[in-house]
Design a protein with these regions (language model features):
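Short beta-strand segments that buttress and anchor functional surface loops
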Residues: 1-6
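FAD/FMN-dependent oxidoreductases across multiple families
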Residues: 160-197
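Glycine-/small-residue-rich beta->alpha transition segments that form the dinucleotide
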Residues: 8, 17-19, 23-28, 166, ...
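Core beta-strand elements of the Rossmann-like FAD/NAD(P) dinucleotide-binding domain
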Residues: 8-19, 194-198
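Glycine- and aromatic-enriched mobile tails/lids
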Residues: 94-105, 109-110, 120, 181, ...
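An anion/pyrophosphate-binding glycine-rich loop and adjacent beta-alpha core
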Residues: 56-167, 171, 219, 233-239
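Glycine-rich loop(s) and the adjacent beta-strand/alpha-helix scaffold that form part
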Residues: 19-76, 80, 128, 217-233
Length: 310
């Protein structure tokens, strides 16, 4: 099972389970070496710690992918991705002097390293918030492909920056590598099984699927293939469940038949294994049926035998 934290209520909740699948994602929010991140707020490496404490092996823990075109300005957008498609459509990467220093569609790690080097060697542009980056020349897209191309093909990017009075069709975007993907993680087999009994893992929390580098979109394998395999493996490994039968319901109905003046049960009848608690039956005292249907003169004081008592 697991102990969960209800963020809305601030309470800890204990959940019993015979199988647990860890899918906690990466650890970008640790902001390793001060890098911004594209990861969600929950990407704090908790899954790695949980698995390690259960005796699971971790691999490639030193390997992370830095997306080369993370936003560096404005501050509210720092770390958010600017898709590679922007570069493949014509936007070039240039330093503060306007010099193009690398091919835009080279491997992510090579491009990210080149941008970091330009900034480290003082050829990057500085922001009012003391960050630095290089320019992604987005106005080139409309110059090369015709006016309106950027807004038509990348409306989300345009709207995102326009909220901060930046028009990417007229102004370049400042970018810097952002901590994007945790290549390493929990060691699992082809079905997502870890070395801890009853524990599976899937997604970015696992390691080995991408080696120590990865290509864009490869995380789809985690979702469509290995996530499904882990779920099926966990399901197949569970012991047979006790079948739900009508035995309890039949016994309770037999007892109610012995109550001479009860015409009908008005309360729902629940299986004790589903209710999880003692079910109190509230009956209404029945009068003789009239022409207008069933009437009641008030609640009954009769206490029927409890079919669920020991």
């Amino acid at each position: 099972g697991a102990v969960l934290w209800d963020r809305n209520k601030g309470d800890l909740v204990t959940v019993s389970a015979r199988a647990v699948i860890l899918a906690t994602g990466g650890s970008g929010q640790l902001r390793l070496q001060g890098f911004p991140t594209s990861n969600h707020l929950g990407a704090t490496g908790d899954g790695l710690v949980l698995a390690y404490r259960q005796g699971c092996k971790l691999l490639h823990g030193e390997s992370y992918q830095y997306h080369p075109s993370g936003t560096a300005y404005p501050e509210a957008l720092v770390g958010q991705l600017v898709t590679e498609s922007i570069r493949s459509t014509g936007a070039q990467v240039v330093n503060a002097e306007g010099e193009r220093f690398i091919g835009e569609m080279t491997f992510r790690d090579v491009l990210a390293a080149a941008i970091i080097r330009e900034v480290a060697e003082k050829r990057g542009a500085q922001t009012p918030t003391h960050r630095a980056g290089v320019w992604l020349d987005t106005p080139l897209i409309d110059i090369i492909n015709g006016e309106g191309t950027l807004r038509r093909q990348f409306p989300g990017i345009v709207h995102r920056f326009e909220r901060y009075q930046i028009d990417p069709a007229k102004q370049p975007i400042l970018i810097y590598p952002t901590l994007h993907y945790q290549n390493g993680g929990i060691q699992v087999d082809r079905d997502g099984c870890t070395e801890a009994k009853g524990l599976w893992a899937a997604g970015e929390v696992t390691g080995g699927l991408h080696g120590t580098n990865r290509l864009m979109g490869n995380s789809l394998l985690d979702i469509t293939v290995f996530g499904r395999r882990a779920a099926l493996s966990a399901q197949n490994d569970l012991p047979p469940r006790r079948p739900v039968t009508l035995t309890c319901l039949k016994k309770s109905r037999e007892q109610f038949k012995n109550i001479s003046d009860r015409r009908e049960v008005l309360s729902p009848q629940l299986f004790p294994t589903q209710a999880g608690m003692k079910v109190a039956f509230e009956l209404q005292k029945a009068e003789e049926p009239s022409a207008t249907g069933f009437n009641s003169s008030g609640p009954s004081t009769y206490e029927p035998p409890d079919p669920f008592s020991k």
